[in-house]
From Swiss-Prot:
Positions annotated with a glycan in the UniProt record: 25, 59, 145, 164, 231, 302, 331
Organism lineage string: Viruses, Riboviria, Orthornavirae, Negarnaviricota, Polyploviricotina
Function per UniProt: Binds to sialic acid-containing receptors on the cell surface, bringing about the attachment of the virus particle to the cell. Plays a major role in the determination of host range restriction and virulence. Class I viral fusion protein. Responsible for penetration of the virus into the cell cytoplasm by mediating the fusion of the membrane of the endocytosed virus particle with the endosomal membrane. Low pH in endosomes induce an irreversible conformational change in HA2, releasing the fusion hydrophobic peptide. Several trimers are required to form a competent fusion pore.
Other notes: Major glycoprotein, comprises over 80% of the envelope proteins present in virus particle. The extent of infection into host organism is determined by HA. Influenza viruses bud from the apical surface of polarized epithelial cells (e.g. bronchial epithelial cells) into lumen of lungs and are therefore usually pneumotropic. The reason is that HA is cleaved by tryptase clara which is restricted to lungs. However, HAs of H5 and H7 pantropic avian viruses subtypes can be cleaved by furin and subtilisin-type enzymes, allowing the virus to grow in other organs than lungs.
Family of this protein: Belongs to the influenza viruses hemagglutinin family.
The protein's name: Hemagglutinin
Location, primary (coarse class): virion
GO cellular component entries: host cell plasma membrane; membrane; viral envelope; virion membrane
Length: 345
């Protein structure tokens, strides 16, 4: 922290703070900080950046994609960085879901955190012959498929008893690990409930049903709610008096999960296989151009200085470091006033 003294006859507008001498006037400085201005978000230079989970799935929310809504099936590109762009709670445009009863809205965020995400090509269990069956796999007019016929989510099978429409004690199904590359397996499941008349018609039991899932040391319990739902439609579909509750469990490589259920279960089918890590940051779409850094408050930044002032928030990439006050590097000498000539005596 040594500033060499020199002599200059010019004024010195530059002041730097030093550790040993406090504020010191110097003949020159190099600014080390910048104050960014807000900009659009961009692709992170040198890496793949993910905006929507499925860029080619038109008119689909990320929750639609995560649940396998029939018209929202597509490839999720790999990415080292992901934009959390759906800042408000979103719904799925299929069968009405009771979103607030589980953590299901977190599913798209969970998937964003992985670099590689793919949907399994086969079903994790044979739902038609699961315990308590045989079952007819239910579909809904509120969830049209690509040919506009009745459909349902690819990640779940709506298990409606074929002939044995009676109450049942809790049943257990094991959910095997079927991913093939050592990935995390994200298994989606749930249950359906309706008013008493519909519950008797579909399942032969109008009482609340009990459900439990267990995987990776995490166990979750639910009891279904019977009736009391107004007719509701999602995305222009057929109004429904029933509701579904949807949850998920994460299975580590080689680990089996279990689901204990009664009537109305939505058994897991296609599962997500996910690996690697993708850094996630809140932002907005579309992504325009490229940037050195993605900042939650300022968007895409190109690094022109090593430090910045302004709003402090999460940032990813080659980013400047946040500081409270501007920093300067002295590249001149300590300023000294011009010497005064002695008067002749």
């Amino acid at each position: 922290d040594l500033i060499c003294t020199g002599i200059t006859s010019s004024n010195s507008p530059h002041v730097v703070k030093t550790a040993t001498q406090g504020e010191v006037n110097v003949t020159g400085v190099i600014p080390l900080t910048t104050t960014p201005t807000k900009s659009h978000f961009a692709n992170l230079k040198g890496t793949k950046t993910r905006g929507k989970l499925c860029p080619n799935c038109l008119n689909c929310t990320d929750l639609d994609v995560a649940l396998g809504r029939p018209k929202c099936m597509g490839t999720i590109p790999s990415a080292k960085a992901s934009i959390l762009h759906e800042v408000k709670p979103v719904t799925s445009g299929c069968f009405p879901i009771m979103h607030d009863r589980t953590k299901i809205r977190q599913l798209p965020n969970l998937l964003r955190g992985y670099e590689n995400i793919r949907l399994s090509t086969r079903n994790v269990i044979n739902a038609e012959w699961a315990p308590g069956g045989p079952y007819k796999i239910g579909t809904s007019g509120s969830c049209p498929n690509v040919t506009n016929g009745n459909g349902f989510f690819a990640t779940m099978a709506w298990a409606v008893p074929k002939d044995n429409k009676t109450a049942t004690d809790p049943l257990t199904v094991e959910v095997p690990y079927i991913c093939t590359k050592g990935e995390d397996q994200i298994t989606v499941w749930g249950f359906h409930s309706d008013n008493e008349a519909q519950m008797v018609k579909l399942y032969g039991d109008s009482k609340p049903q009990k459900f439990t899932s267990s995987a990776n040391g995490v166990t979750t319990h639910y009891v279904s709610q019977i009736g009391g739902f107004p007719n509701q439609t999602e995305d222009g579909g057929i109004p429904q008096s029933g509701r579904i509750v949807v949850d998920y469990m994460v299975q580590k490589p080689g680990k089996t999960g279990t689901i204990v259920y009664q009537r109305g279960v939505l058994l897991p089918q296609k599962v997500w296989c996910a690996s690697g890590r993708s850094k996630v940051i809140k932002g907005s779409l579309p992504l325009i151009g490229e940037a050195d850094c993605l900042h939650e408050k300022y968007g895409g930044l190109n690094k022109s200085k090593p430090y910045y002032t302004g709003e402090h928030a999460k940032a990813i990439g080659n980013c400047p470091i946040w500081v409270k006050t501007p920093l300067k590097l002295a590249n001149g000498t300590k300023y000294r006033p011009p010497a005064k000539l002695l008067k002749e005596r």
